[in-house]
Amino acid sequence: MSQHILKNTIEDLELVRSKSPLVHNITNYVVMNNTANALLAIGASPIMAHAIEEVEEMVTICSATVINIGTLSEPWIQSMEKAAKKAVSLGKPLVLDPVGAGASNIRNAAIRRILDAGNPTIVRGNASEILSTLSSSGKTKGVDATDSSESAVETGKSLSKVTGGVVVISGATDFILKGTDMAQISNGDALMTKVTGLGCTASALCGAFAAVQKDQFRAATSAMAVMGIAGEMAKSKTASPGSFQVAFLDALYELNADTIKQKLNAK
């Protein structure tokens, strides 16, 4: 286990809880409630706002913005472009979750437009989404990964060079990449794939940690460590997806330094 990542994760979790950062989310209908509750459970303060008339104001008052393209329409894409441009102009953390990248032309176009508006400090997705974000060669099965996280590492490194930011590839092992830096988090549980929106939750947590930790690589690594450990804690209480969702929120709320020390599997 990496003692460096262990120390950082404990410190960054305390920062989130002590500062309770406002995190602006333009996210999808499917996960809004779960995402907001997860942010509250970890100690952050969520704002869920997508109206184009107010996104610039929301970006301005919040400490980070998370853009999630799960349920798209043209007005939403315009809001995302506007929010991305504003976040970059203010030098604030911007997280992009390219949900279902490669599944449709509108998703691919939306990703290009958002990237043109402003490079995110963190991009988080599964292997297929990361592959398709950089090129059209990845194949997407709905919004679930059909590629292993390992298979997307080189593409993730290339995407990091394009954006100048961090790329997180979620999977059985999570890879966090920026330039020549790479961290691996091997926590979590397979039951997490049976609850919709936990990938979206991971992106929101990246936003919360990025809001309080200037080192975006460190912030993303800490967020993914917390995500995986909370998943293991939830699985220890239930073996079914319905109760797992509730147990996961409880785990985020109850997570402490001792549990992180016991469970973290990172390098």
UniProtKB/Swiss-Prot annotation:
Disulfide bonds: none annotated. Its cofactor is Mg(2+). GO terms for biological process: thiamine biosynthetic process; thiamine diphosphate biosynthetic process. The keyword Transferase applies. It comes from Leptospira biflexa serovar Patoc (strain Patoc 1 / ATCC 23582 / Paris). Pathway: Cofactor biosynthesis; thiamine diphosphate biosynthesis; 4-methyl-5-(2-phosphoethyl)-thiazole from 5-(2-hydroxyethyl)-4-methylthiazole: step 1/1. Substrate binds at residues 48, 197. Transmembrane segments: none annotated. Its EC number is 2.7.1.50. Belongs to the Thz kinase family. This is Hydroxyethylthiazole kinase. Catalyzes the phosphorylation of the hydroxyl group of 4-methyl-5-beta-hydroxyethylthiazole (THZ).
